[in-house]
């Protein structure tokens, strides 16, 4: 695996830290079942509507923030070669039957960001059957995309893809250039991951700034075509379910 674009940090979390994350994810999912506020997103599956994402998790969870700003930040700092600052975090749940994402590069979603790196931390085992990531290392430039922000098919077909399976507590570290995609979850259990994204500290790319801009972009995209999205680009392969409310910085689960 090309260390300039990706790396796997085996046992990125200690058993105690992983237990903390597992407990937090379960509790947050329980909050989502009773409320549509605080950045919860749902998708339609063959089993009915299911939660697929919660954004800005550490805004309401000091235990998750301690992981994002502690051991995970240390990994991001080592990869960036300078002090890292978290500007975004989310949990992707990928419930049974949950959809994956089409081939894309994160850099397209953050065109004004400086160098960035994201850590995808496995809460559950990420396997081929449960929809782990496929990556194409070695890319150091933006690839052409269609109007959804998805890498064009003829480019995708020419890339050398590698499957990355993770054990709980492992982390896949990726930069903004790395093309990646994932398949649907074909198992009978969730495939949850925490994704934390970092930029160099002092770069001006901050959590508040990112989520303010995201809210405006999401509202504009919905107004333009009437489609509710879970991402700023339309690279989600599933069918989103629009919530009654969305407030990613509201820090409320009541």
Where are these regions (language model features)?
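Conserved double-stranded beta-helix
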Residues: 142-179, 183-254
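A structural signal for short, well-ordered beta-strand segments
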Residues: 89-91, 119-121, 194-198
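Non-heme Fe(II)-dependent double-stranded beta-helix
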Residues: 1-4, 8-103, 109-110
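A short glycine-rich, His/Asp/Glu-containing loop-to-beta-strand
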Residues: 7, 50, 89, 116, ...
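Short, solvent-exposed loop/turn segments at secondary-structure junctions
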Residues: 13-15, 92-94, 108, 126, ...
């Amino acid at each position: 695996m090309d260390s300039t674009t990706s790396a796997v940090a085996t046992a990125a979390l200690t058993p105690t830290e992983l237990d903390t994350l597992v407990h937090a994810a379960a509790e947050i999912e329980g909050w989502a079942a009773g409320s549509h506020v605080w950045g919860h997103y749902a998708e339609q599956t063959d089993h009915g509507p299911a939660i697929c994402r919660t954004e800005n998790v550490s805004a309401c969870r000091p235990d998750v923030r301690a992981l994002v700003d502690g051991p995970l930040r240390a990994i991001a700092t080592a990869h960036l070669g300078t002090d890292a600052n978290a500007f975004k975090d989310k949990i992707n749940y990928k419930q049974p039957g949950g959809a994956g994402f089409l081939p894309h590069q994160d850099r397209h979603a953050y065109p004004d960001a400086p160098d960035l790196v994201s850590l995808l931390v496995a809460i559950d085992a990420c396997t081929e059957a449960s929809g782990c990531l496929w990556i194409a290392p070695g890319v150091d430039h933006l690839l052409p995309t269609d109007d959804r922000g998805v890498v064009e098919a003829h480019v995708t077909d020419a890339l050398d893809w590698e499957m990355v399976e993770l054990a709980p507590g492992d982390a896949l570290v990726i930069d903004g250039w790395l093309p990646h995609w994932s398949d649907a979850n074909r198992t009978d259990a969730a495939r949850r991951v925490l994704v934390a994204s970092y930029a160099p500290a002092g770069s001006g790319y901050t959590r508040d700034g990112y989520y303010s801009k995201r809210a405006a972009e999401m509202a504009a995209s919905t107004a333009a075509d009437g489609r509710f999205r879970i991402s700023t680009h339309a690279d989600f392969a599933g069918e989103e379910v629009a919530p009654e409310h969305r407030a990613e910085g509201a820090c409320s689960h009541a």
